[in-house]
UniProtKB/Swiss-Prot annotation:
Belongs to the class-II pyridoxal-phosphate-dependent aminotransferase family. Histidinol-phosphate aminotransferase subfamily. GO terms for molecular function: histidinol-phosphate transaminase activity; pyridoxal phosphate binding. It catalyses: L-histidinol phosphate + 2-oxoglutarate = 3-(imidazol-4-yl)-2-oxopropyl phosphate + L-glutamate. It comes from Bacillus cereus (strain ATCC 14579 / DSM 31 / CCUG 7414 / JCM 2152 / NBRC 15305 / NCIMB 9373 / NCTC 2599 / NRRL B-3711). Its EC number is 2.6.1.9. Residues 1-11 have a biased composition (Polar residues). This is Histidinol-phosphate aminotransferase 2. Its cofactor is pyridoxal 5'-phosphate. It comes from the Bacteria. The keyword Transferase applies. Residues 1-21 are annotated as: Disordered. Pathway: Amino-acid biosynthesis; L-histidine biosynthesis; L-histidine from 5-phospho-alpha-D-ribose 1-diphosphate: step 7/9.
Length: 366
Protein backbone atom coordinates (compact mmCIF):
# COMPACT_ATOMS: atom_id res chain seq x y z
CA UNK A 1 0.00 0.00 0.00
CA UNK A 2 1.31 3.43 -0.92
CA UNK A 3 1.33 6.48 1.33
CA UNK A 4 2.62 9.99 0.72
CA UNK A 5 6.31 10.01 -0.23
CA UNK A 6 7.09 12.73 2.30
CA UNK A 7 6.09 10.50 5.21
CA UNK A 8 9.34 8.57 4.76
CA UNK A 9 11.25 11.59 6.09
CA UNK A 10 9.14 11.85 9.25
CA UNK A 11 8.93 9.93 12.50
CA UNK A 12 5.95 9.55 14.84
CA UNK A 13 6.05 11.94 17.78
CA UNK A 14 8.01 10.43 20.65
CA UNK A 15 6.98 11.83 24.05
CA UNK A 16 9.34 11.70 27.00
CA UNK A 17 9.39 8.52 29.03
CA UNK A 18 6.72 8.10 31.69
CA UNK A 19 7.69 7.39 35.32
CA UNK A 20 6.68 3.76 34.75
CA UNK A 21 8.99 3.45 31.74
CA UNK A 22 11.82 5.11 33.66
CA UNK A 23 11.61 2.46 36.39
CA UNK A 24 12.44 -0.21 33.84
CA UNK A 25 15.78 1.50 33.12
CA UNK A 26 16.75 3.36 36.29
CA UNK A 27 15.30 1.22 39.03
CA UNK A 28 12.10 0.88 40.98
CA UNK A 29 11.93 4.19 42.80
CA UNK A 30 9.70 7.22 42.47
CA UNK A 31 10.17 9.65 39.60
CA UNK A 32 9.15 13.28 39.22
CA UNK A 33 8.27 14.17 35.63
CA UNK A 34 9.66 17.59 34.71
CA UNK A 35 9.99 17.01 30.98
CA UNK A 36 6.68 17.97 29.35
CA UNK A 37 5.85 21.37 30.88
CA UNK A 38 2.80 20.11 32.74
CA UNK A 39 1.44 21.90 35.79
CA UNK A 40 2.92 20.15 38.87
CA UNK A 41 -0.01 21.39 40.97
CA UNK A 42 -2.66 19.91 38.71
CA UNK A 43 -5.92 21.69 37.91
CA UNK A 44 -8.29 23.94 39.81
CA UNK A 45 -9.98 22.22 42.79
CA UNK A 46 -13.26 23.49 41.34
CA UNK A 47 -12.78 21.18 38.36
CA UNK A 48 -12.31 18.13 40.55
CA UNK A 49 -15.27 19.04 42.75
CA UNK A 50 -17.66 19.66 39.87
CA UNK A 51 -16.66 16.57 37.90
CA UNK A 52 -17.29 14.39 40.94
CA UNK A 53 -20.73 15.90 41.39
CA UNK A 54 -21.83 16.04 37.77
CA UNK A 55 -23.27 13.30 35.61
CA UNK A 56 -22.46 13.10 31.92
CA UNK A 57 -24.49 10.99 29.52
CA UNK A 58 -21.73 8.72 28.26
CA UNK A 59 -23.81 7.12 25.51
CA UNK A 60 -24.36 10.45 23.75
CA UNK A 61 -21.96 12.37 21.56
CA UNK A 62 -20.56 15.60 23.02
CA UNK A 63 -21.67 19.03 21.85
CA UNK A 64 -20.01 19.05 18.45
CA UNK A 65 -19.53 22.79 18.49
CA UNK A 66 -18.32 23.05 22.11
CA UNK A 67 -20.90 25.84 22.34
CA UNK A 68 -20.81 26.56 26.07
CA UNK A 69 -17.02 26.48 26.24
CA UNK A 70 -16.60 28.68 23.18
CA UNK A 71 -19.09 31.21 24.55
CA UNK A 72 -17.29 31.42 27.89
CA UNK A 73 -13.96 31.88 26.13
CA UNK A 74 -15.46 34.53 23.85
CA UNK A 75 -17.03 36.46 26.73
CA UNK A 76 -13.82 36.54 28.72
CA UNK A 77 -11.67 37.53 25.75
CA UNK A 78 -14.21 40.07 24.42
CA UNK A 79 -14.64 38.43 21.03
CA UNK A 80 -17.56 36.74 19.29
CA UNK A 81 -18.20 33.04 19.82
CA UNK A 82 -17.90 32.62 16.05
CA UNK A 83 -14.27 33.73 16.35
CA UNK A 84 -13.34 30.76 18.57
CA UNK A 85 -12.37 27.27 17.43
CA UNK A 86 -11.87 24.47 19.98
CA UNK A 87 -9.72 21.43 19.35
CA UNK A 88 -8.33 18.32 20.98
CA UNK A 89 -5.27 20.19 22.20
CA UNK A 90 -3.27 22.62 20.12
CA UNK A 91 -1.78 19.66 18.27
CA UNK A 92 -5.11 19.09 16.54
CA UNK A 93 -5.57 22.79 15.83
CA UNK A 94 -2.11 22.97 14.24
CA UNK A 95 -3.11 20.00 12.09
CA UNK A 96 -6.41 21.66 11.14
CA UNK A 97 -4.69 24.89 10.13
CA UNK A 98 -2.06 23.07 8.06
CA UNK A 99 -4.61 20.91 6.31
CA UNK A 100 -6.91 23.85 5.54
CA UNK A 101 -4.30 26.32 4.32
CA UNK A 102 -1.34 24.48 2.81
CA UNK A 103 -0.94 23.02 -0.67
CA UNK A 104 1.99 21.22 -2.26
CA UNK A 105 4.50 23.83 -3.42
CA UNK A 106 3.68 26.31 -0.67
CA UNK A 107 6.08 27.06 2.15
CA UNK A 108 5.91 27.93 5.82
CA UNK A 109 8.39 30.01 7.77
CA UNK A 110 9.23 29.52 11.42
CA UNK A 111 12.17 29.30 13.79
CA UNK A 112 14.71 26.51 13.64
CA UNK A 113 14.34 25.64 17.33
CA UNK A 114 10.65 25.77 18.15
CA UNK A 115 7.59 23.53 18.53
CA UNK A 116 8.19 20.74 15.97
CA UNK A 117 4.57 20.15 14.94
CA UNK A 118 4.58 23.24 12.68
CA UNK A 119 7.26 21.62 10.53
CA UNK A 120 5.78 18.13 10.83
CA UNK A 121 2.39 19.01 9.38
CA UNK A 122 3.81 21.25 6.66
CA UNK A 123 5.87 18.35 5.35
CA UNK A 124 2.83 16.06 5.41
CA UNK A 125 1.05 18.59 3.17
CA UNK A 126 3.97 18.60 0.74
CA UNK A 127 5.29 22.04 1.68
CA UNK A 128 8.75 23.50 1.98
CA UNK A 129 9.80 24.48 5.50
CA UNK A 130 11.96 27.57 5.89
CA UNK A 131 13.57 27.62 9.31
CA UNK A 132 15.35 30.69 10.66
CA UNK A 133 17.88 30.37 13.47
CA UNK A 134 17.00 31.89 16.82
CA UNK A 135 18.89 34.98 17.91
CA UNK A 136 20.12 34.31 21.46
CA UNK A 137 17.17 31.99 21.98
CA UNK A 138 14.60 34.45 20.58
CA UNK A 139 12.63 34.42 17.31
CA UNK A 140 14.49 36.60 14.80
CA UNK A 141 11.49 38.31 13.20
CA UNK A 142 13.62 40.57 11.04
CA UNK A 143 15.30 37.58 9.43
CA UNK A 144 12.00 35.70 9.19
CA UNK A 145 10.49 38.66 7.36
CA UNK A 146 13.34 38.60 4.85
CA UNK A 147 12.66 34.98 3.82
CA UNK A 148 8.88 35.28 3.48
CA UNK A 149 7.90 35.21 -0.20
CA UNK A 150 4.80 34.89 -2.38
CA UNK A 151 4.62 31.15 -1.69
CA UNK A 152 4.67 31.58 2.08
CA UNK A 153 1.22 30.65 3.31
CA UNK A 154 1.88 30.46 7.07
CA UNK A 155 4.36 32.06 9.46
CA UNK A 156 4.39 30.24 12.78
CA UNK A 157 5.47 32.20 15.86
CA UNK A 158 5.64 30.42 19.20
CA UNK A 159 5.49 33.21 21.77
CA UNK A 160 6.80 32.53 24.37
CA UNK A 161 8.90 30.01 22.53
CA UNK A 162 9.14 26.34 23.30
CA UNK A 163 11.80 25.10 24.10
CA UNK A 164 13.70 28.29 25.01
CA UNK A 165 11.04 30.13 27.06
CA UNK A 166 11.96 33.45 25.47
CA UNK A 167 9.53 35.94 23.95
CA UNK A 168 9.15 38.56 21.24
CA UNK A 169 8.06 41.89 22.66
CA UNK A 170 5.09 44.00 21.60
CA UNK A 171 7.03 46.49 19.49
CA UNK A 172 8.87 43.87 17.46
CA UNK A 173 5.80 41.72 16.85
CA UNK A 174 3.64 44.66 15.80
CA UNK A 175 6.34 45.90 13.44
CA UNK A 176 6.67 42.43 11.95
CA UNK A 177 2.93 42.01 11.37
CA UNK A 178 2.73 45.38 9.64
CA UNK A 179 5.33 44.21 7.12
CA UNK A 180 3.70 40.90 6.15
CA UNK A 181 1.19 40.58 3.33
CA UNK A 182 -2.36 39.74 4.36
CA UNK A 183 -2.13 36.79 1.97
CA UNK A 184 0.14 35.11 4.52
CA UNK A 185 -1.42 33.72 7.69
CA UNK A 186 0.45 34.61 10.88
CA UNK A 187 -0.22 32.05 13.60
CA UNK A 188 0.85 33.12 17.09
CA UNK A 189 1.05 30.13 19.41
CA UNK A 190 0.56 31.39 22.97
CA UNK A 191 0.40 28.05 24.78
CA UNK A 192 2.21 29.59 27.76
CA UNK A 193 0.36 32.91 27.74
CA UNK A 194 -0.98 32.62 31.30
CA UNK A 195 2.54 32.32 32.75
CA UNK A 196 3.83 35.55 31.20
CA UNK A 197 4.75 38.39 33.57
CA UNK A 198 6.73 40.63 31.18
CA UNK A 199 5.10 44.03 30.83
CA UNK A 200 6.07 44.39 27.16
CA UNK A 201 4.59 41.05 26.10
CA UNK A 202 2.22 41.56 23.14
CA UNK A 203 -1.54 41.63 23.62
CA UNK A 204 -2.43 39.97 20.37
CA UNK A 205 -6.23 39.74 20.45
CA UNK A 206 -6.78 43.47 19.77
CA UNK A 207 -4.70 43.03 16.60
CA UNK A 208 -7.48 40.86 15.14
CA UNK A 209 -9.60 43.97 14.60
CA UNK A 210 -7.05 45.40 12.18
CA UNK A 211 -5.44 42.31 10.67
CA UNK A 212 -7.47 39.53 9.05
CA UNK A 213 -4.46 37.24 8.71
CA UNK A 214 -3.76 36.63 12.42
CA UNK A 215 -4.69 33.54 14.38
CA UNK A 216 -3.96 33.25 18.12
CA UNK A 217 -3.63 29.84 19.78
CA UNK A 218 -3.97 29.06 23.50
CA UNK A 219 -4.42 25.91 25.56
CA UNK A 220 -5.77 24.40 28.76
CA UNK A 221 -2.86 21.94 28.95
CA UNK A 222 -0.33 24.15 30.70
CA UNK A 223 -1.33 26.67 33.40
CA UNK A 224 -4.84 25.24 33.69
CA UNK A 225 -3.44 21.78 34.40
CA UNK A 226 -5.75 19.89 32.04
CA UNK A 227 -3.20 18.25 29.73
CA UNK A 228 -4.88 14.83 29.85
CA UNK A 229 -8.22 16.35 28.75
CA UNK A 230 -6.73 17.72 25.50
CA UNK A 231 -8.37 21.11 24.99
CA UNK A 232 -6.90 23.97 22.99
CA UNK A 233 -8.46 26.88 21.15
CA UNK A 234 -7.83 29.36 18.37
CA UNK A 235 -9.14 32.91 18.05
CA UNK A 236 -9.31 34.68 14.70
CA UNK A 237 -11.55 36.35 12.16
CA UNK A 238 -14.98 34.75 11.75
CA UNK A 239 -14.41 33.95 8.06
CA UNK A 240 -11.20 32.07 8.83
CA UNK A 241 -12.66 30.16 11.78
CA UNK A 242 -15.60 29.11 9.61
CA UNK A 243 -13.22 27.61 7.03
CA UNK A 244 -11.19 25.84 9.71
CA UNK A 245 -14.37 24.30 11.09
CA UNK A 246 -14.86 22.57 7.73
CA UNK A 247 -11.64 20.65 8.37
CA UNK A 248 -12.23 20.05 12.08
CA UNK A 249 -13.40 16.56 12.94
CA UNK A 250 -16.92 16.35 14.39
CA UNK A 251 -17.20 15.82 18.15
CA UNK A 252 -13.47 16.45 18.55
CA UNK A 253 -13.60 17.61 22.20
CA UNK A 254 -15.18 15.18 24.66
CA UNK A 255 -18.01 16.17 27.00
CA UNK A 256 -15.74 15.64 29.99
CA UNK A 257 -13.03 17.85 28.50
CA UNK A 258 -15.52 20.61 27.65
CA UNK A 259 -16.90 20.51 31.18
CA UNK A 260 -13.45 20.61 32.79
CA UNK A 261 -12.22 23.47 30.60
CA UNK A 262 -15.38 25.50 31.18
CA UNK A 263 -14.96 25.27 34.95
CA UNK A 264 -11.20 25.89 34.86
CA UNK A 265 -11.55 29.01 32.72
CA UNK A 266 -13.58 30.67 35.46
CA UNK A 267 -11.10 30.15 38.29
CA UNK A 268 -8.87 33.22 37.98
CA UNK A 269 -7.64 32.92 41.57
CA UNK A 270 -6.17 29.50 40.84
CA UNK A 271 -4.26 30.83 37.81
CA UNK A 272 -2.96 33.80 39.79
CA UNK A 273 -1.58 31.46 42.45
CA UNK A 274 -0.06 29.15 39.85
CA UNK A 275 1.70 32.08 38.18
CA UNK A 276 3.01 33.34 41.53
CA UNK A 277 4.46 29.97 42.51
CA UNK A 278 5.86 29.42 39.02
CA UNK A 279 7.61 32.79 39.07
CA UNK A 280 9.22 31.87 42.39
CA UNK A 281 10.34 28.57 40.88
CA UNK A 282 11.93 30.30 37.91
CA UNK A 283 13.76 32.59 40.32
CA UNK A 284 15.18 29.52 42.08
CA UNK A 285 16.74 28.28 38.85
CA UNK A 286 17.84 31.69 37.62
CA UNK A 287 19.54 32.52 40.93
CA UNK A 288 21.38 29.20 40.88
CA UNK A 289 22.53 29.74 37.31
CA UNK A 290 23.76 33.27 37.97
CA UNK A 291 25.62 32.24 41.12
CA UNK A 292 27.39 29.43 39.26
CA UNK A 293 27.95 31.14 35.89
CA UNK A 294 25.70 28.65 34.11
CA UNK A 295 24.06 29.97 30.92
CA UNK A 296 20.28 30.09 30.74
CA UNK A 297 17.54 31.83 28.78
CA UNK A 298 15.28 34.11 30.86
CA UNK A 299 11.89 32.42 30.71
CA UNK A 300 8.30 33.62 30.49
CA UNK A 301 6.95 30.08 30.73
CA UNK A 302 6.78 27.23 33.24
CA UNK A 303 10.15 25.84 32.16
CA UNK A 304 13.73 26.98 31.83
CA UNK A 305 16.26 26.15 29.13
CA UNK A 306 19.97 25.86 29.85
CA UNK A 307 22.10 25.95 26.65
CA UNK A 308 24.86 23.72 28.01
CA UNK A 309 27.04 20.88 26.77
CA UNK A 310 26.64 17.23 27.73
CA UNK A 311 22.85 17.43 27.90
CA UNK A 312 22.51 13.66 27.84
CA UNK A 313 24.92 13.32 30.74
CA UNK A 314 22.87 15.77 32.81
CA UNK A 315 19.69 13.94 31.85
CA UNK A 316 21.18 10.68 33.11
CA UNK A 317 22.29 12.26 36.39
CA UNK A 318 18.80 13.65 36.97
CA UNK A 319 17.20 10.33 36.04
CA UNK A 320 19.30 8.43 38.57
CA UNK A 321 18.16 10.96 41.18
CA UNK A 322 14.50 10.44 40.26
CA UNK A 323 13.90 13.48 38.02
CA UNK A 324 12.82 13.31 34.38
CA UNK A 325 13.96 16.35 32.37
CA UNK A 326 14.16 16.93 28.59
CA UNK A 327 17.54 16.80 26.84
CA UNK A 328 18.15 18.59 23.53
CA UNK A 329 21.22 18.56 21.27
CA UNK A 330 22.20 22.00 22.56
CA UNK A 331 20.94 22.01 26.15
CA UNK A 332 18.36 20.87 28.67
CA UNK A 333 14.81 21.98 29.37
CA UNK A 334 13.42 21.66 32.88
CA UNK A 335 9.79 22.11 33.84
CA UNK A 336 9.39 24.25 36.96
CA UNK A 337 8.07 22.04 39.75
CA UNK A 338 7.30 22.53 43.41
CA UNK A 339 9.92 24.28 45.55
CA UNK A 340 11.15 20.92 46.83
CA UNK A 341 11.32 19.43 43.34
CA UNK A 342 13.26 22.43 42.06
CA UNK A 343 15.70 22.13 44.96
CA UNK A 344 16.21 18.47 44.12
CA UNK A 345 17.05 19.16 40.48
CA UNK A 346 19.29 22.08 41.42
CA UNK A 347 21.20 19.80 43.78
CA UNK A 348 21.87 17.39 40.90
CA UNK A 349 22.94 20.25 38.64
CA UNK A 350 25.22 21.61 41.35
CA UNK A 351 26.96 18.27 41.68
CA UNK A 352 27.28 17.87 37.92
CA UNK A 353 28.88 21.25 37.32
CA UNK A 354 31.16 20.93 40.35
CA UNK A 355 32.39 17.59 39.02
CA UNK A 356 32.91 19.17 35.61
CA UNK A 357 35.01 22.00 37.09
CA UNK A 358 37.01 19.54 39.18
CA UNK A 359 37.72 17.38 36.14
CA UNK A 360 38.79 20.44 34.15
CA UNK A 361 41.21 21.50 36.91
CA UNK A 362 42.65 18.00 37.14
CA UNK A 363 43.27 17.92 33.39
CA UNK A 364 45.02 21.30 33.54
CA UNK A 365 47.28 20.14 36.36
CA UNK A 366 48.08 16.79 34.76
Amino acid sequence: MQVKDQLSSLQPYKPGKSPEQMKEVYGDHSFVKLASNENPFGCSPRVLDELQKSWLEHALYPDGGATTLRQIIADKLHVKMEQVLCGSGLDEIIQIISRAVLRAGDNIVTAGATFPQYRHHAIIEGCEVKEVALNNGVYDLEEISSVVDNDTKIVWICNPNNPTGTYVNDRKLTQFIEGISENTLIVIDEAYYEYVTAKDFPETLPLLEKHKNILVLRTFSKAYGLASFRVGYAVGQEELIEKLNVVRLPFNVSSLAQKAATIAFGDDEFIEEIVRVNTEGLQQYESFCRENDIPFYPSQTNFIFLPVENAREIYEACAHAGFIIRPFPNGIRITVGTREQNEGVISVLQQHFENKKRKSRDEENA
